[in-house]
């Protein structure tokens, strides 16, 4: 996905006259030599590095070297030589996960570093724990498959009535027993602590990982400082991943056990616990382009937010740009740009929580299921919702829009 996003942004920058140097992280040492030659030859030009999720900022060979100190230049945060501080190039890093995932890389960040976050709660986290980092909120975007009319010539996208799939979900699923390996080597007291945090967050899905994590840490350690709190946050990855996959399973289970078929593109759906696994139509792994192609052939695209409470995920924007109606839980940001039943279908995570607590009583999810079944019988209404969503997203939520905002930061 990150490579796909990069290509989309690069298209815009090339279109407005910028030259693009692609750095190959799979051949980092060779690519570094090419980069160094290119940089030395074009030193008078202005360079900006653009990356996602700290790729190229993780100590990769070539870009980071412990036995070399050109010009004797060192990062204020590290004693290793690195190309970014040697060159002084501005590095813009788009972080599409919670910053707690990248604690160690933030501590070793380049001197001329700018971070883009896609959730305003992540911005608050950065301002609190990394106040010296320049941070900007730019919401996630999507890609319109048929923008050039190559996929479907008759219209902007395939009409709802002609789409072969009722419901699609793109993305992977990882069950708890696999995620548990992240903390199994800890002492039992620590395991119990993180399991308790997970239990509380699962029971209160409106809360953020920041809120629940800090609450429990302060209850456990009364005098904990912000610095100590920050050091404890990375292990909350276990909680964050678990809660998102837990609700992903609940959403899919609620639909398939009600007789709806859900087409999945991604790994791990054989682990979903439900009464009617035959209604999960597993297509296996798929890359970003394949996922987009399949979304453009589905009537409804299911989404479960990766615990973004004030941001968006590319999955719902991709759905809107490709003619599928997005069925998703909400966030404060999504509430600002979408209206339920007009250009999107919202469901409530509290409903899924109560569904599980009831022993998976179908009466709990019946209003959502009935709504979906009725809409699947009403192609005109689904088409209207899809068209309304497309009109919202086509001019303001594409990667060109992200690139325009990045250009202002350059």
Label every model-predicted segment:
Residues 55-64, 173-176, 345-354:
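Short regulatory "switch" loops immediately downstream of catalytic or recognition motifs
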